[in-house]
């Protein structure tokens, strides 16, 4: 799991590696496994990521409703051996998506009004084998 706090943040990218993730677990469960604090919105408390490790601050994002790109939001990316070595935006939310052996997942903070909604994670995944 990769957490990229965005280009305007002074926070370092967080990278957590997992080897034995049960296939019945969702990507949302990876937050608990990594000891990262995650908050959902009031509408989707375990389905839409609003805040990771206190970012953005409660003053910036109240997490009552689903934030828009104009307000600032987290973008969710995945990659796995069948996709090659590049990132793609996930077509599913974290509560539905299942981790893939050898894959990576990334969360990128998109600053409101920045126009960088297509920005990829600031981390290059390396191929991994699965047992």
Tell where the protein language model's regions lie, with residue ranges.
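Ubiquitin-like/PB1-type beta-grasp interaction modules and other compact soluble beta-rich domains
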Residues: 1-131
